[in-house]
Amino acid sequence: MENSMTRGEMMKLSIVQLLVGLAIAIVLCAPGYGQEDVSKFPSKPITYIVPVTPGTGTDLSVRLIAKEAEKFLKQAIVVVNKPGGALTLGTAAIATAKPDGYTIGFTGGPPLFLTPLLEKVPYDPIKDIRTIMQYGGFNFGVYVKGDSPFKTFKELVAYARQNPKKATYGTVGVNGMPNIMMEEVAKREKVQITHIPFKGTSEGQTALLGGHTIFGAGDFNASLVEAHEIRLLMMLKDEPSAEYPGVPTLKELYNLPYPMYISIITQRNVPDAIVKKLDDAFAKAMKEPAFISGMKELQLPIIYRSGKDLDPYVLQSYNYFSRALKEMGAIK
């Protein structure tokens, strides 16, 4: 007797195998497969990656909000510093993490919309990352020596117009945001200014106080403002500064953006429900007295913005700096 299946039996078996395969594929592709029940999230500690060194103002702000958010998430938040690569090493670790919400991180903005334009990075800032929320901002500005004759930014511009290339200014590095925005302002005002890059904020401020530059742009030591050793002429930010009322912003004077913020990001494919849960917890943490007093001590403004509002701003900033860098000749 021939031990073989008939043609009909083979067809039936093939159909059964096909149906089983389809069923497995549907299950594997179903939303939420392999993910824990959102209602149980988080069921283990969350890793919070910070791409800067420990002890900086940014790092301390992360530790402040993480400590308060633990109360609402009922899980530990482990802060892990991954500095290097102009903040891209830590950002890459967030972008390539498992999209389960257990890896989140800090960004100030540039690793998403500026650095990727200037150098190759191991992530796509738009496709690989999403924002959970913003909880703070920075106080950056344009400043002169305390005894400078310039009392307003317009007076500084007038000097630059009358003295081409003699208005020297310091920032931290070439093609950083302060450098780009000062060149943008110079272009609008049709003046020529001279950029002098420094390795750090303190080095640039020392040069300013020593009379080696006319003005500085970017981060500054708040204690020097309080001691009247430097004078702020313009804030490099979108919103007026509560800490420095009366000082006009770049947005007010030139309608130019300065997208620097303290926000929490995660992998792009983390489910919306988990992102909302994280957003809610960190938003509550912002209202805790310890967080508020801590941010005040760090002299960092508290600003809330949802990821839904911030993500389009990231894309807008990416497009803006792409154009600005091309016009400066920094990229093709």
For the regions a language model picked out, list residue spans one by one.
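Short, low-complexity disordered leader/linker segments with a strong preference
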Residues: 1-43, 332
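An extracytoplasmic/periplasmic, membrane-proximal ligand-sensing/linker region
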Residues: 7-8, 43-45, 187-191, 272-332
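N-terminal (or domain-start) structured segment
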Residues: 34-128, 165-166, 174, 178, ...
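Hinge/capping helix and adjacent helix->loop/strand transition within the periplasmic-binding protein
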Residues: 93-102, 117-203, 250, 255-294
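Short secondary-structure boundary segments
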Residues: 108-109, 146, 219-221, 237, ...
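Conserved helix-loop-beta element of the AMP-binding
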Residues: 130, 229-242
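Short, charged, surface-exposed secondary-structure boundary motifs
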Residues: 207, 242-246
